[in-house]
């Protein structure tokens, strides 16, 4: 049985080493517990077995633990200007032996999910390993040597979804300079790179190498919707509505950019509508009284 509170205490102690007066540090602490909250909801709604749910919560708690050292060393959260933060998170966990009490297969499953949480797509070897299992071993908790591969893939999907769900909240409510490195006033004068808009039209994630402007990053956030794996995740994003708010409060100066923003929002709305109109009762209850983030 995984003692989540023990790991939570470790995270709190580790994060306390860094300067909370820096809004970016506080942002990541709040984000971590918000992702944990979303993960709890996804696990409950998907009726995951306790073992898988326990590992999923560890993925949520530690997925961004490398962010603190990234900020300390490079003074930025931008991976392309510093280091891959998922890889750094895994390095921190390994070097500090944080997960050593877990069985090796569980430890490696958590690390694999964390390593994959920020990538453009899940490592094909992870997907291939799961798909090579017999159908009767695909269900989580099923006996046999193949079920662990299916569980690893499930953990990858869960942490990618939970992280993206809360990134929309961060996008809408935190200081934009902390989030993307530019103010909303600066972004209002920017344009959207054609390659970024093309990715959105194809319902694809945006390769960070294609981004040229901060507004490109905003569009990249919208494209997260297309990479969500579960209907429950789509409904969380749709119901909270955070994805729209920065666009709604920004007066874009360039007419072409304004038109493209409108097109992008309409495309995302239409995509989410295809996942159905009915919000499950348990999910409605979550929105009425969301769990505490810390």
Each language-model region and where it sits:
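Generic alpha-helical structural context detector
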Residues: 58, 112-115, 157-160
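Divalent metal-dependent phosphate-bond-processing catalytic cores, especially two-metal-ion Mg2+/Mn2+ enzymes
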Residues: 25-29, 33, 37, 41-52, ...
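Hydrophobic/aromatic-rich structural module bridging two neighboring secondary-structure elements via a short loop
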Residues: 68-109, 115, 119-121, 144
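Alpha-helix initiation and N-capping motif
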Residues: 4-8, 107, 152
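Acidic/His-rich, divalent-metal-binding segments that scaffold phosphate/diphosphate chemistry
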Residues: 1-87, 294
């Amino acid at each position: 049985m995984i003692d989540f509170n023990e790991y939570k205490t470790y995270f709190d102690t580790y994060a306390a080493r860094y300067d909370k007066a820096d809004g970016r540090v506080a942002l990541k602490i709040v984000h971590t517990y918000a992702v944990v909250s979303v993960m709890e909801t996804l696990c409950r709604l998907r009726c995951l077995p306790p073992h898988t749910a326990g590992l999923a919560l560890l993925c949520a708690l530690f997925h961004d633990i490398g962010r603190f050292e990234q900020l300390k060393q490079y003074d930025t959260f931008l991976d392309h200007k510093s280091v891959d933060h998922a890889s750094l998170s895994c390095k921190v966990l390994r070097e500090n032996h944080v997960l050593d009490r877990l069985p090796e297969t569980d430890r490696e499953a958590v690390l694999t999910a964390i390593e994959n949480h920020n990538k453009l797509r899940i490592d094909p070897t992870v997907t291939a390993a799961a798909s090579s299992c017999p159908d009767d071993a695909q269900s989580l908790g099923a006996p046999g040597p193949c079920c662990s591969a299916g569980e690893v893939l499930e953990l990858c999907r869960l942490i990618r979804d939970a992280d993206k769900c809360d990134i929309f909240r961060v996008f809408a409510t935190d200081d934009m300079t902390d989030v993307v490195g530019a103010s909303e006033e600066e972004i209002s004068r920017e344009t959207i790179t054609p390659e970024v808009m093309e990715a959105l039209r194809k319902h694809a994630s945006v390769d960070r190498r294609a981004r040229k402007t901060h507004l490109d990053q905003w569009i990249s956030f919208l494209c997260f919707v297309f990479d969500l794996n579960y209907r429950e995740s789509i409904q969380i994003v749709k119901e909270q509505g955070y994805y729209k708010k920065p666009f709604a409060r920004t007066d874009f100066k360039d007419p072409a950019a304004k038109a493209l923003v409108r097109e992008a929002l309409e495309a995302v709305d239409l995509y989410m509508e295809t996942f159905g109109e009915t919000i499950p009762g348990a999910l409605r209850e979550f929105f009425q009284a969301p769990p505490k983030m810390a």
